[in-house]
Amino acid sequence: MLGSLSKDAVAKSLVSRLGKKNVMQVPRVVKVCLNMGIGISAADSKVMDSCTRDLAMISAQKPVVTRARKSIAGFKIRKGFPIGCMVTLRGKRMYEFLDRLINIALPRERDFRGLSTSQLDGHGNISFGIKEHISFLEVDYDKIDKVRGLDVVIVTTATNDADAKALLLELGFPFMN
């Protein structure tokens, strides 16, 4: 499993690669946030239920419904209107999700060439989108009403992009050259 690998082998190899003095200074993954925006079709409760069901199957955790903070007439939404769902993964579930993401979902993604270094935010975190949530094996293609995308944010304790990229490369994330 990726969690035990992260704490032992990855940390020891990062100590020498990053020039740190001990294992506690090495960056680690803190949490993974998954967000699925639904858009204007959120008025239909069936769409909302299917999105929360799909995200729950992907993350193995019940998602929270996100609601609009203020009304925007141009988008035809009112305050409190459901606009998506999100889930935050930590600990064992986070490492299980990262393992499935790296080894199953990203290779199945259509036209995926690797993550870009421009997706790092300058503070050691990375955000990217997955175009089709059916890349995950947990989602049954016959039971979905529409193929949707989702956003993935990986938060690390790294203070810069170089340390974060080194951590993600050790975990097995594919980066473009």
Swiss-Prot record:
Signal peptide region: none
Protein name, entry field: Large ribosomal subunit protein uL5
GO molecular function: rRNA binding; structural constituent of ribosome; tRNA binding
Assigned GO CC terms: ribonucleoprotein complex; ribosome
Any one GO BP annotation for this protein: translation
Subunit structure: Part of the 50S ribosomal subunit; part of the 5S rRNA/L5/L18/L25 subcomplex. Contacts the 5S rRNA and the P site tRNA. Forms a bridge to the 30S subunit in the 70S ribosome.
Family: Belongs to the universal ribosomal protein uL5 family.
Superkingdom as given in the UniProt entry: Bacteria
Database matches in Pfam families: Ribosomal_L5, Ribosomal_L5_C
Species in which this protein is naturally found: Anaplasma phagocytophilum (strain HZ)
Keyword list, A-Z: Ribonucleoprotein, Ribosomal protein, RNA-binding, rRNA-binding, tRNA-binding
HAMAP family: Ribosomal_uL5_B
Record's keyword annotation contains ATP-binding: no
Known function: This is one of the proteins that bind and probably mediate the attachment of the 5S RNA into the large ribosomal subunit, where it forms part of the central protuberance. In the 70S ribosome it contacts protein S13 of the 30S subunit (bridge B1b), connecting the 2 subunits; this bridge is implicated in subunit movement. Contacts the P site tRNA; the 5S rRNA and some of its associated proteins might help stabilize positioning of ribosome-bound tRNAs.
